[in-house]
């Protein structure tokens, strides 16, 4: 029987002053549970919840895109044998806006984006159709096990 992956989690919430209701939805144990559900190997991750300015700056600096995005993943493992290491950056106002536009609970959207970002940290991508289909199927399966509906419906 295989053991569940171990997670070392650094949770940062500099946006808490502006988005206290988001921080209240995201206690450490909840965030860790969602990430562990998406980890296939031991991991060391930092999750940082930011405002629009920091999100835009990071997206512009590292992706060349001058706007805030919902989640950025910075993966640092150099080989498949290394533990999963990375930073997940979630932009609170973008996540809130998307959840409202999509008619889904904020907590469900955060769960989806944390699972999505964790998969990116493990090398999954969605730049081509086949990869996108595989990644979406994995996300949907993980979220169902966590009690959330299919985020793509």
From Swiss-Prot:
Q: What class of enzyme is it?
A: hydrolase
The record, for Gene3D superfamilies, names:
Metalloproteases ('zincins'), catalytic domain
Co-factor binding comment:
Binds 1 zinc ion.
Matching entries from InterPro entries are given as: MetalPrtase_cat_dom_sf_prd (IPR023091), YbeY (IPR002036), YbeY_CS (IPR020549)
Keywords from the named record: Cytoplasm, Endonuclease, Hydrolase, Metal-binding, Nuclease, Ribosome biogenesis, rRNA processing, Zinc
A Pfam family per the record: YbeY
Its predominant location is: cytoplasm
**Keyword Metal-binding belongs to the record:** yes
Indicate yes or no for the key word Cytoplasm: yes
Q: Which GO terms describe its biological process?
A: rRNA processing
Q: Give the protein's cofactors.
A: Zn(2+)
Cell compartment(s), UniProt: Cytoplasm
For this protein, the Enzyme Commission number is 3.1.-.-
A cellular component term from Gene Ontology for this protein is: cytoplasm
PANTHER family noted in UniProt: ENDORIBONUCLEASE YBEY, CHLOROPLASTIC
Q: Which family does it belong to?
A: Belongs to the endoribonuclease YbeY family.
Instruction: State what this protein does.
Output: Single strand-specific metallo-endoribonuclease involved in late-stage 70S ribosome quality control and in maturation of the 3' terminus of the 16S rRNA.
The name this protein goes by in its record: Endoribonuclease YbeY
Mind giving the lineage of the organism this protein is from? Bacteria, Pseudomonadati, Pseudomonadota, Betaproteobacteria, Burkholderiales
Provide the gene name from the record: ybeY
